[in-house]
């Protein structure tokens, strides 16, 4: 790339930085005064004319200033040399805040609230998808001799509790035996395989007396928990941040809010995140959702030990602090995976 092209990109970068900071169209005089480009205002004006002709910036109204287009933001993001680094103290504070979560729900609620505060945008976190989960542990607790509490804990930290009513009561020895049988069938297996294994166990013991009835009743409840509990869940935080930037959406804020409420569009975008640590930036029409026009989505996946648990990210107007937001999304995702993987 020639020096003129490099200089024009520096002009574009200055326009993006100043427009994000001020919300005002940027003129050549302001660029020369604020940025040490080493060229005259006339040269900057010529560069801006080329950038406008190529579709990177546009003139919003009669103002002499220019603002970035979606194409301009994309060029800026694609050529980011440095993402704003977070200090060690900031990283430790994030990790400590997330580690204080008492369970999966609390960790994810803390994560979405923290990400919204850090970025001043809407934060979204997808609950771990059950299809990729394995059963870490099964607890069987006798509430009464004929009433059991089954607690299924997945490797992502998800906890499901179910009550089983038995036909006949069981004693402590039978309870331990039941726990061992069910645990052997379930633990360490993906949810689909675990449901098959516990069903096979019930079929094998059917009609043999002893614990067969207790196993059969428990298996029915467990299969419902493992297979039928398939809804996708999404946590949102910071929706009030959208109202601070109403003008940036060009009248499309209502459709963005409706998309957030319905969740389908956002879940589809997050489902595309298949690699933890890789941050994706979708700008405007790159979201491929009409209701999200004028919106940028910065997303990644979170997980542990090479396994993806779910997607997360932020969305807001295209006029966004991309370097800072990318860094925050990456850091929070990293620490969610670390916290959940250690539980």
Swiss-Prot record:
SUPFAM superfamilies named in the record: GAF domain-like, Winged helix' DNA-binding domain
InterPro entries: GAF-like_dom_sf, HrcA, HrcA_C, WH-like_DNA-bd_sf, WH_DNA-bd_sf, WHTH_transcript_rep_HrcA_IDD
Listed GO MF terms: DNA binding
Keywords, alphabetical: Repressor, Stress response, Transcription, Transcription regulation
Pfam families per record: HrcA
Secreted recorded as keyword: no
GO BP annotation list: negative regulation of DNA-templated transcription
Family per similarity comment: Belongs to the HrcA family.
Task performed by this protein: Negative regulator of class I heat shock genes (grpE-dnaK-dnaJ and groELS operons). Prevents heat-shock induction of these operons.
Name of the protein this chain belongs to: Heat-inducible transcription repressor HrcA
Organism: Mycolicibacterium vanbaalenii (strain DSM 7251 / JCM 13017 / BCRC 16820 / KCTC 9966 / NRRL B-24157 / PYR-1) (Mycobacterium vanbaalenii)
């Amino acid at each position: 790339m020639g020096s003129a092209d490099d200089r024009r990109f520096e002009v574009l970068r200055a326009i993006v930085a100043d427009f994000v900071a001020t919300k005002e169209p940027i003129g050549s005089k302001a660029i020369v005064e604020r940025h040490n480009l080493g060229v005259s205002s006339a040269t900057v004006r010529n560069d801006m004319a080329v950038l406008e002709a190529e579709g990177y910036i546009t003139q919003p109204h009669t103002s002499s200033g220019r603002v970035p287009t979606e194409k301009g933001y994309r060029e800026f993001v694609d050529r980011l040399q440095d993402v704003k680094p977070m200090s060690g103290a900031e990283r430790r504070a994030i990790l400590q805040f997330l580690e204080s979560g008492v369970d999966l729900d609390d960790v994810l609620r803390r994560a979405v609230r923290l990400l919204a505060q850090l970025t001043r945008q809407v934060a979204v976190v997808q609950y771990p998808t059950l299809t990729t989960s394995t059963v870490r542990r099964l607890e069987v607790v006798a509430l009464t001799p004929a009433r059991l509490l089954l607690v299924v804990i997945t490797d992502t930290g998800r906890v499901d509790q179910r009550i089983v009513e038995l036909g006949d009561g069981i004693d402590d020895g039978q309870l331990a035996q039941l726990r061992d049988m069910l645990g052997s069938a379930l633990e360490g297996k993906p949810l689909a395989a675990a449901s098959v294994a516990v069903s096979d166990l019930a079929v094998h013991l059917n009609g043999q007396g002893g614990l067969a009835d207790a196993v059969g009743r428990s298996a029915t409840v467990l299969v419902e928990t493992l297979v039928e509990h398939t809804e996708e869940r999404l946590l949102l935080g910071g929706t009030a941040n959208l109202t601070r930037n109403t003008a940036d959406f060009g009248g499309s804020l209502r459709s963005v809010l409706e998309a957030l409420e319905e969740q389908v569009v956002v879940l589809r975008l997050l489902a595309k995140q298949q690699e933890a640590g890789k941050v994706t930036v979708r700008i405007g029409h790159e979201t491929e959702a009409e209701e999200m026009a004028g919106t940028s989505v910065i997303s990644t996946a979170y997980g542990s030990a090479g396994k993806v648990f779910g997607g997360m990210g932020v969305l807001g107007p295209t006029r966004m602090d991309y370097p800072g937001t990318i860094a925050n999304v990456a850091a929070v995702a990293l620490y969610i995976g670390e916290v959940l993987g250690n539980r």
